[in-house]
Amino acid sequence: MTRVPRGYIARRRRTKMRSFASNFRGAHLRLNRVITQQVRRAFVSSHRDRGRQKRDFRRLWITRINAATRVYNVFNSYSKLIHNLSKKELILNRKMLAQVAVSNPNNLYTISNKIRIIN
């Protein structure tokens, strides 16, 4: 029985996987079976870490806001600041508040004074 070479479909599939693994090293770059395993693993990690990145950034923003509120005596804690913001219906998300807390803490103090005046 003569040998039948595989068609272009398998070659196209392998070159596509190889293009995903272009920055890998060693066997992860050269061997087809290892390439498919590592590319699948990389895709799983990237899918998982897209969700994790959102959680991590939210945690970072909350930490920055909490530190700024305690240092500059805006309110006693982060939770009281967020509670008063929502009670007064001021629409500032945590990302914006963290940016204000890091770049210009005086504006954070001004925001807290606005909340107290509305009371």
Swiss-Prot record:
One of its GO terms (cellular component) is ribonucleoprotein complex. Transmembrane segments: none annotated. It comes from the Eukaryota. Keywords: Chloroplast, Plastid, Ribonucleoprotein, Ribosomal protein, RNA-binding, rRNA-binding. GO terms for biological process: ribosomal large subunit assembly; translation. InterPro entries: Ribosomal_bL20, RIBOSOMAL_L20_CS, Ribosomal_protein_bL20_C. Binds directly to 23S ribosomal RNA and is necessary for the in vitro assembly process of the 50S ribosomal subunit. It is not involved in the protein synthesizing functions of that subunit. This is Large ribosomal subunit protein bL20c. It comes from Zea mays. The gene is rpl20.
